[in-house]
A protein has these predicted regions:
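Short helix-coil-helix linker/hinge
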Residues: 104-112
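A short, charge-rich alpha-helical start-of-domain segment used by transcription regulators
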Residues: 1-23, 27, 33, 112
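DNA-recognition helix of helix-turn-helix
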Residues: 132-156
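Internal acidic/polar
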Residues: 73, 80-105, 124
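Structural recognition of an alpha-helix C-terminal capping motif at a helix-to-coil junction
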Residues: 23, 37-44, 48, 57-69
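Arg/Lys-rich amphipathic alpha helix in sigma70-family domain 2
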Residues: 51-54, 65-84
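A short pre-motif secondary-structure segment
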Residues: 114-118
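Residues within helix-turn-helix
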Residues: 33, 126, 137
Length: 156
């Protein structure tokens, strides 16, 4: 695939899936402004590095990985994990939603990524493995452990 064709594929994916990338960034950083910055920086990097895209078929997974990497870079710069008190919760949110948000916030960053990708972004285990550069079995076992941690925190 030629460089111009790759750039076009990346640009089209960014346009078609912008909301999805924003939701992913927002679910990781829980700030509208920061999520917008992350998506903008991710889009720029995706276009500039489009020659490293190997196959058109994986463009969405590739861009999701860039968004996650940018969110991780954001946290490294801030040295601060998102706090439930900073979340924009509507009055319709129930105590269960708040408890779930707190439980998810208490997970390690990689664990939180897996849970968000699986249950909030509806990614398949295989897609998560590609995005996180892990084996499918590793993702499955981490997801299982995360669900156990969440269950204990929500029941206790």
């Amino acid at each position: 695939m030629k460089k111009i064709a790759r750039e076009e594929v990346v640009q089209n994916a960014l346009i078609e899936n912008y909301e999805k990338y924003y939701r992913l960034a927002y679910s990781l950083v829980r700030s509208e402004a920061d999520a917008l910055d992350i998506v903008q920086e991710s889009a720029y990097k995706a276009i500039m590095k489009s020659e490293s895209l190997r196959t058109e078929e994986f463009v969405d997974t590739w861009i999701c990985r860039i968004v996650i990497n940018e969110a991780n870079a954001f946290f490294r710069k801030k040295r601060d994990l998102p706090d439930v008190s900073e979340m924009n919760l509507s009055t319709e949110d129930t105590y269960t939603d708040i408890d779930l948000a707190r439980a998810i916030d208490s997970l390690e960053p990689k664990e939180r990524e897996i849970v968000i990708l699986r249950y909030f972004e509806d990614k398949k285990i295989e897609e998560i493995a590609v995005i996180m550069n892990e084996k499918v079995g590793t993702v499955k076992s981490r997801l299982y452990r995360c669900m156990e941690k969440l269950r204990v925190r929500l029941e206790g």
